[in-house]
Amino acid sequence: MFRRDLRRWAAEGLSYLTLDADVKEKLMEDEGAIKALIELAKAEKNEDCAYGVVTLLVNVTNSFEKQEIMPEMLELAKFAKHHIPQEHELDDEDFVDKRIWTLGEWGITSALVAFYKNDSQNIQELIARVLNAVCKFTELRGFVVQQGGSKALAALALEGTEKGKRHAAQGLARIGITQDPAIAFPGNRVSKKTLLEI
């Protein structure tokens, strides 16, 4: 029991720390730590560590929504001499893409698949965001399908938050463009009703 709690706390602590781009890069240098998180997700398959692991992955892949700052607010902040947060150079697209690519190769989809049946719609949305980010890369879509990601995305596209459904549908569309449907969606016939729901 204590060991399980310790793992959960470690995952939640790392999820908070990965808001910092320097920590994201340091974590990505430690393949063992990432693989331990994947194994934790596959072993636990419960809500205890789901939030920490999935939030960490959202932070590392920058799959969260970025708030747009209106130009008027920017000018007002400058006038008031208020600090305006700048995006960290390690959160540039090249660095983020490299992190997503590495996570995809290391099998992060299997960790997300372990959690997709979670009752929390917020966790489901976060899973859809990360899977969609991995599906951005044509070469990784095969890994996503092999590890059960297309099945998870299909389920997430039909239930959960609107944003979660949208991300899941986009991930499915990306898979559908490049993968053989008989392989990506075995045994599933997509009905017109399902397509309209998505």
What does each of the following model-derived ranges do?
Residues M1-F2, K45, E89-E93, L112-Y116:
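Acidic, Ser/Thr- and Gly/Pro-rich intrinsically disordered linkers and low-complexity segments
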Residues V54-A111:
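Acidic, serine/threonine- and proline-enriched intrinsically disordered linkers and terminal tails
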Residues A21-K26, A33, I38, I100, ...:
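Alpha-helical solenoid scaffolds in large eukaryotic transport, assembly, and signaling factors
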Residues M1-L19, K26-E29, K45-E72, N118-K136, ...:
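Alpha-helical solenoid repeats of the armadillo/HEAT superfamily
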Residues M1, A36-I38, R99, I108-Y116, ...:
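Buried hydrophobic core positions in alpha-solenoid tandem helical repeats
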Residues K26-G32, I69-E75, T102-S110, A114, ...:
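Short sequence/structural elements of tandem HEAT/ARM alpha-solenoid repeats
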Residues S110-V113, N132, G142, A154, ...:
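Register-specific detector for alpha-helical tandem repeat solenoids, activating on a conserved position
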